[in-house]
């Protein structure tokens, strides 16, 4: 495969192969075209890049460590496992990498109001954080179901000055929150910047979010070179929309010796229908401004996604992931709720790190694979977020298990 096949752009129409694009209402088309122009100009502006680097270093706290997970490695008895510690960022996840980039772009474009959608609440918190830092009003759309299971993050957003709009339509989760945010954007096109949290949405969002997250992979390459003197043998990251994964993967797509694994949320199992594994259990379609793999019924209606992790509970996936799946550069697998919970507990007890439930899906896949790999195999997992937000979910699950016992 050539570079152009693995890293195809996107092209001028926002397409990665047949995925991506700009499927938006007529009222939004001038806005997304303007955003694409502004983003291209910003990328070429040394002042913008200098300001971005300043905030990455002094506000987010980058670079974060590449940590050798010694006890987990011993426990698995195979591959040498490293964690890219995105949970050590300010706000506790990878989301802020993207939010800082987009808020600087909003400021450059003269926008006076931020809106965002959130599932687990981490993107909402990161958006509220940068809104506070830059003195901008901020409205966060969040599904009512997610508000119930992410009370701590809802409170954090309010503390930071954000207005939370509960979304009761549909299943009251991330898909529905994104629908409402898009409606707001159509209504308030002049002064509002829509800060999308993942590598989805109409072009230029998938490429722009990937670019702001690609610092994860760039740092990983340099840090592993320093520690081990070579490339990783495998990369593993969880995939909902897929921004933490794209941030880690993109840097290594041309390095064919590096095996790349994306981990979807298998829920109760892909064969049960109660999951959020768009690539393993979906078909191509159009949602939220782009063509990608989606969970759909026989009539083409979007079906409900399920995952114990609110951040993976989305019935689609970023279009670049769909492309990488089709060209077979990245292997996409699924992990069930129970497997993710087991990995969550193992990481807590072996490494003294409480990972997010999203991240626990990647950890579960690593724990499955590592024992069958040689001891000199270098495996990097994106530790995309910390698990403070998931305490209630885990407590509820443990209480339910005790009742059954």
From Swiss-Prot:
Cofactor: pyridoxal 5'-phosphate
UniProt EC number: 4.2.1.20
Keyword Lyase applies: yes
Residue positions where N6-(pyridoxal phosphate)lysine is found in the record: 95
Protein name: Tryptophan synthase beta chain
Pfam families: PALP
HAMAP family: Trp_synth_beta
Pathway involvement of the protein, from the record: Amino-acid biosynthesis; L-tryptophan biosynthesis; L-tryptophan from chorismate: step 5/5
Complex formation: Tetramer of two alpha and two beta chains.
Lineage: superkingdom: Bacteria
InterPro entries: Trp_synth_b_CS (IPR006653), Trp_synth_beta (IPR006654), Trp_synth_beta/beta-like (IPR023026), TrpB-like_PALP (IPR001926), TrpB-like_PALP_sf (IPR036052)
Family of this protein: Belongs to the TrpB family.
Function: The beta subunit is responsible for the synthesis of L-tryptophan from indole and L-serine.
Organism field: Pseudomonas putida (strain W619)
Enzymatic reactions: (1S,2R)-1-C-(indol-3-yl)glycerol 3-phosphate + L-serine = D-glyceraldehyde 3-phosphate + L-tryptophan + H2O
PROSITE patterns attached to this UniProt entry: TRP_SYNTHASE_BETA (PS00168)
Cited PANTHER family: TRYPTOPHAN SYNTHASE, TRYPTOPHAN SYNTHASE-RELATED
Zinc in keyword set: no
